[in-house]
Each structure stands twice: as structure tokens, then as C-alpha cells.
Amino acid sequence: MKKFSMRVVLIISVLFIALGNANVSIAQERDTTNKLPEEELGSLDTSNIIAEEVAQDKPAEVEQLEEIPTTDELMQNPDVLEKSVADSDDPDLTVVDSGAYWTIYRNTVNNEYSLRMFGNVPSSKPTAWNSYLKSIKHIEIEEATLTGNFASYFDNSAFPALESVRIEQCNLSGVTSFASAFYSSGIEKVIIRDNDYPTAPSLLTTQAMFGYANKLTELDVSGLDTSAVTNMQNMFQYCRALEELDVSHFDTSSVTTMRGMFQYCELLDKLDVSNWDTSSVTTMMSVFAECNSLEILDVSNFDTSSVTDMTAMFQNCYALEKLNISNFDTSSVTKMYAMFSGLYEVGKLDASNFDTSLVTTMNRMFQNCKSLKELDIGNFNTSLVTDMDRMFINCAALKSLYLDNFTTAKTMTDMFTGTTSLTYLFVSHNLSTFTGLENTSWYDEKNWVQFSNLSQLQTYHRKQSEPTGYRKGEFLSLTMDAMGGEFEDA
């Protein structure tokens, strides 16, 4: 403003000098408010005067002002660029540090630190973050392109105070790994949604991605493309506080291992995996183990033809009332240890079509199936099984059991212990030991031979050459004479 005023004064002075030779009397008669005619103003040469004005020294106030670089200067000289700062609509947030693709804020109200990322985000962390890592509670990544291996990126060792992460409207095509990304963190909320994959996804592993995130209560993974993922082992293991989880959209066609995937998700009451393609999966060990609250689980369409390990697959799914495994192809399975152990509420299991010709371990397979009343596994081939310890232990409601093709295993400790309701046992002649079977009266239903204790039953059974059915209790004999007949105790 001062520079503009000086220029006006100089121009006016020149005009007065130029008009000095004019008729004074005429000038005096004119109204001083009138403007000079345009032709007179246009004839004035003020170039020298303006040049002189520009050459003058700058006022002191102007000298003290910083020069503002032009856009061209900024582009040509990166040293004058300011650190990039992401815009924030929150008036309580104050920028404390920033870089090319990130900004760290401090909330002036609660003194919490947050990190926002944008643009091209690499998988490495800048050293500038080091002094803030222990304080950052919230991370937001929006409209960014993530590239590389993000294994353990948000875990407890990296951000010990982290409570929430949001990854939204990002290009995740270039991410190769999210293994242990949130492992063992105290995180409570993770939102991964509305993301873009302009090229084929590179994500190969989500192993333990949320493993041991036992404070996690809100999780949205709808924006995660899993079509290339081969490893989902322990992905949600020990998410003990999580009550809801939608994975119905997961493309699991490339997955080979689901070991422990949902193990110890103790508060989940439903899980929709009904449309999953599991044709490539080789291990399902503990995939749903310890999902204590799970009430609804449909695995009827699972393709298990490639699975070799079903150890503890449904172990301690206490609340599950129905389980349809009738279509399972178990021809490649070698391990079934504790597969159905702890299914307290399931009253019926149809495993009659199971091919167990390669299975070596069946110990605790039906342990604590307290509501199971009938079990037909007469088709089981146990010729390779070495361990049947506690196979039916505490199946307290089981009334009938069919073991047509069973053979004696190396270890069979407490195989029938706790089967207090068992009244009928149809068993192969190649199974000679009934460890734990109730020591009471039994009889051969075909030959009507009575046994007063378990020892007599086993001795008799070892002499049989074909499968035999035994019933608990004492049979009544009918004695006929000329006067009629009467039942007598055996």
C-alpha cells in the first residue's frame, strides 16, 4: 500500500510541472475537481519518472518482509519447499510434524497423537517417526497407494499405544504381505474398506494379521482382496473380544492353509463361510477351535479333498448345535485328533461317509460330545491308526455306537470312559480292547450270552470272528413247560 501511494504522489507532481506553463488564469477558473482531458494525459511521458521511483530505496518495512517464492521457483528449487501438510477439518488438531506422504497431529483437547498418510506410501517407516511411535493412538490412510511388504507394520512393537487404524479409498494392488500386521496390538478398531485394485492383487499372506489382537472389538475387512492369498494361518487367532466378523466375501480359492484361522474367537456367535472355495486347502487344523460362542456355522459346501490335517478343527465349539459334515471328502486326511472334541450341544454327527484309510491319529476325536446320542462310524477304516486314547471319553448321552471296521490301536487309554448312557455297542472282531467301557452286565444280542462284567465281555469278544453287537444289562430267558412259560433272569 505504501509503495502504491508513493507512485501516485510522483505522478501527480509530474502533472503539475507539465502544466506549469499553462494559462494560470484559465487554470484558476477551472474546478479543481475536474479531471484533465484524456488527450492531455495520454501525451505525458512518465517512463523516466516511474523508472526513478522503482530505483528508489525500499522502505525499511518492506526490507524486513520475506520474499515469497513463485511457483516456478518452487519447482526449480526443492530446497524452498515446505514440508507437506495434510488438511484437517478438526480444529482441535495441531500439526507437530510432517513429510512427503504423512502428517502427525496432536489433539489439543486430549493430547492424543494421530498419524495420517496419503499419496505414495512405502512399507518402510521414516526415522522422523521414532520420537512419536509410543504416542500415536490413531492412524488414517486415505487416498493413498500402498506398495510392498507391510508385515508387522502396525503391531505392538511398532505402535504400542495404537487404538485404531483406518485404510480407506486406497490402492492396495501392490501390497504383498499383511502378515502379523496388527499382531499382539492393543488395537480396538480396524477399518479396511472401499479400497481399489486397479491391477491384479499381489497380497500372498495374511498369516496372523490380527493374531492376538485381543482388545479388537470392531473390524471391517470388506476392502481386502484375498484372491491371491495362499496363507491365512492364525489370521484372526485370539481375537477374543470380537463379537462380529464378516468374511463372507473372502476369495479363498488360492488358500492352502487355514490353520488356527479363527482359533479363540471366543465371542463370535456366527460366521458365514458357506460360499468359500476350499479346494486348495491342505490344513484346517484348529480353524474353528475354541470358538466357544459360535452357534451358526455352515461348512456343508467345503471341498476338503486336499486337506491332510483336521486336528481339532471344531474343538470346543461349545454352543454349536448343528454341524453338517456329511459331504466332507477325507480321503487325504492323516490326522483327526480332537476333531469334534467339546461339541457340547451337537446331538447328531453324520460321519458315515468318511474315508479314514490314511488317518493315523484319532485320539480325543469325540471327547466331551456331551449331547451326542448316536454315532455311526462303522465305515471308518482304522488300519493305520496308532492312537485312540479317550476317543469317546465323556460322551455321556451316547446310546449307540457302531464300530464295524475298527482295529486295535497301539494306545487306547480311556477310549470309552464316561459313556454312561451307552446301551448298545456294535464292534469289529478286530478291536479287542474296550478300555473305560462301563463295568457292568452286558450280553451278546445274537447268541444271548450273558456277561456280568467287562472282563468277561472282552474275553468272549476276542474269540469272535465277525463283528458282534452287545447290549447293556441282563436279558430275560423264557422257560417253557407243559403249563406254559415264564421269564427268568439270566
Locations of the language-model features?
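Bacterial N-terminal signal peptides that target proteins for export
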Residues: 1-9
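Structural signature of tandem-repeat unit edges
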Residues: 112-120, 134-146, 160-176, 185-204, ...
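Secondary-structure capping and domain/repeat boundary segments
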Residues: 475-490
